[in-house]
């Protein structure tokens, strides 16, 4: 069964694969994981190839919004390196999509050309030490004082905050009792007085730091900092749940499919090369069944991803389908990678082999972008399933 993609998407995939053979070999990916550091300037050759411009309108120096292309790039990058895929997400999904959808004219003029050129990366500052799934409970506060905004509080699990240029932060900006009407989104330059950033070691996705960020009387210009300027003040929840939400969710299934594809490719090849009991292990029924099950599950994941991509690209309602894809694809791709690890045996467990890294990188995806439990709650609510 073939997934019919537009011809230009096939060309994009081919171009990305050729570029990766130059700038991101398997040895590079292994080294970034070992060092827990990926060079941020790797975004520049992606931009030079025009990949960052697929998230920016032509009038701002891009090639026009192409969600199909962006998600294809995320998938292809993740096959080689999840953290390289993360760099691209920090530029396109976190940066360009949000600013193009909700930024003020001044913000668009300032940010979008730089994002198209690969000059800027954004970190997501939504979660806090005491706030995870319930984002309406954020405690970081922003106070307006004339033409300034003063920020105090803390963010947690803010990937890339120590190296990326801006932090896209959800804050409480008013005392309204309706928790959805007193939130704003701020674009906070990392190198600002009053910001302290510390890092946390993580199991996987090594190369981009996971950070805690604290704000101590951080003072910034109001119009430049509040997403949308004056019209965005106290409209943060509307913007967060707005036109870019589905694109932000579907990037997780795209990364998951990329990682799972890499794992299955390796297991498929290994099973044809490894011999035990006088035959290749792919001749043993148990291994054959594991490989076929993985192939079947991966195709189902790709079909769900493709369906959601088309809905989002055509601006059709996709909230339920995207939540289902986030739930099913993330969970299923974890299963695929874990089964592929079993096929490699000890070689799938030992450091220095790609499979061990793929296992560590995939584990977090059912948590990212809204956990599987939250997706199930959301899906049930969207189907209006009674709670009493």
PLM regions: where:
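Amphipathic, small/basic residue-rich leader segments at the start of a protein or domain
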Residues: 1-87, 110, 114-117, 335, ...
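Glycine-rich beta->alpha junctions and the first turn(s) of the following alpha-helix
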Residues: 3-12, 196-299, 365, 381, ...
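C-terminal helix-coil-helix/basic helical segment that borders enzyme active sites and/or dimer interfaces
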Residues: 27-34, 268, 272-279, 295-328, ...
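A structural signal for short hydrophobic beta-strand segments in well-ordered beta-sheet cores
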Residues: 140-143
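A short core secondary-structure module
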Residues: 148, 152-198
């Amino acid at each position: 069964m073939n997934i019919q993609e537009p011809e230009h998407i096939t060309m994009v995939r081919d171009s990305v694969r050729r570029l990766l053979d130059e700038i991101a070999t398997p040895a590079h990916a292994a080294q970034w994981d070992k060092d827990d550091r990926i060079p941020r300037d790797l975004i520049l050759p992606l931009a030079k190839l025009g990949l960052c411009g697929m998230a920016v309108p032509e009038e701002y120096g891009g090639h026009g919004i192409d969600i199909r292309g962006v998600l294809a790039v995320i998938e292809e990058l993740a096959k080689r390196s999840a953290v390289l895929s993360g760099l691209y997400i920090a530029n396109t999904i976190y940066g360009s999509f949000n600013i193009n959808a909700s930024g003020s004219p001044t913000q668009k003029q300032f940010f979008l050309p730089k994002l198209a050129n690969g000059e800027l990366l954004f970190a997501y500052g939504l979660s806090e030490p005491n706030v995870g799934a319930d984002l309406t409970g954020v405690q970081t506060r922003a106070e307006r004082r004339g033409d300034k905004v003063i920020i105090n509080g803390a963010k947690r699990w803010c990937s890339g905050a120590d190296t990326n240029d801006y932090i896209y932060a959800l804050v409480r900006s008013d005392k309204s009792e309706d928790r959805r009407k007193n939130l704003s989104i701020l674009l906070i330059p990392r190198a600002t007085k009053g910001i302290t950033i510390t890092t946390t070691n993580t199991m996987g996705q090594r190369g981009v730091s996971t950070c805690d960020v604290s704000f101590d009387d951080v003072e910034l210009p109001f119009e430049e900092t509040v997403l949308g300027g004056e019209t965005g003040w106290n409209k943060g929840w509307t913007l967060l749940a707005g036109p870019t939400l589905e694109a932000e969710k579907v990037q997780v299934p795209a990364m998951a499919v990329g990682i799972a594809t890499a794992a299955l490719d390796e297991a498929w090849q290994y099973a044809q090369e490894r011999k035990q009991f006088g035959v290749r292990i792919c001749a043993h029924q148990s291994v054959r069944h594991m490989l076929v099950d993985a192939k079947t599950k991966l195709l189902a994941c790709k079909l769900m991803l493709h369906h959601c991509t088309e809905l989002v690209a055509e601006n059709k309602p996709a909230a339920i389908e995207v939540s289902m894809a986030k739930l099913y694809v993330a969970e299923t791709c974890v299963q695929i990678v874990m089964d592929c690890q079993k096929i490699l045996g000890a070689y799938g467990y030992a450091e220095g082999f790609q499979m061990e890294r793929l296992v560590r990188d995939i584990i977090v995806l059912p948590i990212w972008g809204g956990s599987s439990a939250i997706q199930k709650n959301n899906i049930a609510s969207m189907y209006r399933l009674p709670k009493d």
